[in-house]
Curated annotation (Swiss-Prot):
Similarity comment: family membership: Belongs to the MtfA family.
A cellular-component GO term for this protein: cytosol
Protein name: Mlc titration factor A
Top EC category: hydrolase
GO molecular function: aminopeptidase activity; metallopeptidase activity; zinc ion binding
Known role: Involved in the modulation of the activity of the glucose-phosphotransferase system (glucose-PTS). Interacts with the transcriptional repressor Mlc, preventing its interaction with DNA and leading to the modulation of expression of genes regulated by Mlc, including ptsG, which encodes the PTS system glucose-specific EIICB component.
Keywords: Aminopeptidase, Cytoplasm, Hydrolase, Metal-binding, Metalloprotease, Protease, Zinc
Details of cofactor binding: Binds 1 zinc ion per subunit.
Superkingdom per UniProt: Bacteria
InterPro entries: MetalloPept_cat_dom_sf (IPR024079), MtfA_enterob (IPR057256), MtfA_fam (IPR010384), MtfA_N (IPR042252)
Primary location group: cytoplasm
C-alpha cells in the first residue's frame, strides 16, 4: 500500500449510497432502467473493492463517491468488474496537481521538469484524479477525466504499457491500429487547419495512439454524436470492444422525448 506524506480522508464502506441522486447527471441520463440497475450493482462492488482517498483537504461524501463509482463502471458495464482489477486505490486531489516528469531524449539524456496533471493511471498502482476536472465529467461534452483514465487501465490489460490497442481478438488488431492511426491523422489535419483550440475533437488525441484511444473513449460515452459520424469504422470497433452503443442510446432517448412531447398535445 502506498504511504502518502500528508493527511488523507478515506470514504467509509458502510455508506447509504444515494444512487438516484448520483444517476441524475447528463452523462447517465440515456441509460435504460435495466442498465442503470446493473451500473449501480457494479458501482457498489467497485466501492467495496477500491479505496477512494481524498488528498490535500478535499472532502469526499456519499454523493461524490457514488458518482465517481458510477462513472468508473460505465465503460465496463458490459465487460464486467474484473476489467478494473489491478488497482486498489483512487486518489483524488481538489484541483490539478504538480508532478515531476522525466523523459529521455534521442541521444539518451534524461530530462526532468515539473508539470501540471489532471489525472494519471499507473501501470501497477492507483488512478489519480482531481475533483475540479472530475466535476466536468458529469456532463455530455466529450470531456471525461474518469473515463480517460479508465481507458488507459483497460488499454494496459493488453501489455506492460498503454498502446492504444486494448485486449481484443488478434484478428482485429491490424484493423484497429489502421483505423486508430487514420483518426489521429484526421484530427491532426484539423488541428493544422483551424488550430488546437478550435478543433472539434480534443487535440490531445493526436499525440499518440494510447491518448487517442483514451480521448476517443471520452467522446464515445459522452459525445457520441461527435465521434460516430466522423469515424464510423473506428466507432464500430469501439462498440464491439465496449459492447455498448451510446449513439443508439442517444437516438432512442431522443425518439422517446419526441413521442412524449407529441403525447402532451
Amino acid at each position: 500500500m502506498i504511504k502518502w506524506p500528508w493527511k488523507a480522508q478515506e470514504i467509509t464502506q458502510n455508506e447509504d449510497w444515494p444512487w438516484d441522486d448520483a444517476l441524475a447527471i447528463p452523462l447517465l441520463v440515456n441509460l435504460t432502467a435495466q442498465e442503470q440497475a446493473r451500473l449501480i450493482a457494479l458501482a457498489e462492488r467497485f466501492l467495496q473493492q477500491k479505496r477512494l482517498v481524498a488528498l490535500q483537504g478535499f472532502e469526499l461524501d456519499s454523493l461524490k463517491s457514488a458518482r465517481i463509482a458510477l462513472i468508473f463502471c460505465l465503460p465496463i458495464l458490459e465487460l464486467g468488474i474484473e476489467w478494473l482489477d489491478g488497482f486498489h486505490e483512487v486518489l483524488i486531489y481538489p484541483a490539478p496537481f504538480v508532478v515531476d516528469d522525466e523523459w529521455e531524449d534521442d541521444i539518451g539524456l534524461v530530462h526532468s521538469q515539473r508539470v501540471v496533471q489532471s489525472g494519471q493511471s499507473w501501470q501497477q498502482g492507483p488512478i489519480i484524479l482531481n475533483w475540479l476536472d472530475t466535476q466536468d465529467s458529469f456532463d455530455a461534452s466529450g470531456f471525461n477525466l474518469i473515463i480517460h483514465e479508465v481507458a488507459h487501465k483497460l488499454d494496459m490489460r493488453n501489455g506492460d504499457r498503454a498502446s492504444g490497442i486494448p485486449f481484443i481478438p488478434l484478428r482485429d488488431v491490424a484493423g484497429w491500429e489502421h483505423d486508430l492511426h487514420a483518426a489521429m491523422n484526421n484530427i491532426q489535419d484539423e488541428i493544422d487547419l483551424v488550430g488546437e483550440s478550435a478543433a472539434s475533437i480534443d487535440a490531445y488525441a493526436a499525440t499518440d495512439p494510447a491518448e487517442c484511444f483514451a480521448v476517443l473513449s471520452e467522446y464515445f460515452f459522452s459525445a457520441p454524436e461527435l465521434f460516430a459520424p466522423r469515424f464510423p469504422a473506428l466507432w464500430q470497433r469501439f462498440c464491439q470492444f465496449y459492447r455498448q452503443d451510446p449513439s443508439q442510446r442517444l437516438r432512442v432517448s431522443a425518439a422517446e422525448g419526441d413521442y412524449g412531447e407529441e403525447s402532451e398535445h
